[in-house]
């Protein structure tokens, strides 16, 4: 199960990094401005939902086949979906926020987003697992 959690965090960091790269590029080329925040965020959320549905479906089936436990598969896949959506949102929000604060949006790139996403995914994973699997723990 440790391996499953690590994959979730890597996926979140990759999704957030991809989103921030596209937003930073758009800001640098003046294709995006801070007033376009909701449009950019909505686009990233739609991409996140498509990616997470595909990845969670495959992940759910893989865990079900490998571990024969639908509850664990649901917890891990649900965490993966939340992590991807949060990472894509952060990847969009943080560079635009930096631009509004007159900071270099590049400082909001991969390392910061990955760190926040890692912390969030661990928090969500354990809380979701405790909540969903609590009847099995007692």
What are these language model-derived features?
Residues 126-138:
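Juxtamembrane boundary at the C-terminal end of a transmembrane helix
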Residues 15-40, 90-113, 138:
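Juxtamembrane helix-loop transition segments at the membrane interface in multi-pass membrane proteins
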Residues 14, 26-30, 52, 64, ...:
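Conserved, well-folded catalytic cores of nucleic-acid-processing
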Residues 57-67:
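Short membrane-interface helical motifs at transmembrane helix boundaries
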Residues 2-6:
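Short, small-residue-biased leader/transition segments that mark boundaries at the very start
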Residues 70-71:
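Hydrophobic packing and interface segments
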Residues 37-49:
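Interfacial transmembrane-helix starts/ends
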């Amino acid at each position: 199960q440790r391996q499953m959690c690590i994959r979730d965090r890597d996926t979140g960091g990759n999704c957030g990094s991809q989103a921030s790269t596209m937003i930073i590029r758009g800001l640098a080329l003046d294709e995006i401005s801070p007033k376009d925040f909701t449009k950019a965020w909505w686009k990233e959320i739609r991409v996140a939902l498509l990616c997470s549905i595909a990845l969670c479906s495959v992940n759910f089936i893989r865990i079900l086949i490998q571990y024969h436990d639908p509850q664990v598969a649901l917890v891990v896949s649900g965490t993966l979906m939340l992590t991807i959506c949060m990472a894509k949102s952060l990847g969009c929000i943080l560079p635009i926020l930096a631009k509004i604060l007159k900071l270099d949006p590049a400082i909001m790139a991969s390392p910061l987003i990955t760190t926040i996403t890692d912390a969030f995914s661990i928090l969500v994973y354990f809380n979701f697992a405790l909540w969903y699997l609590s009847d099995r723990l007692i």
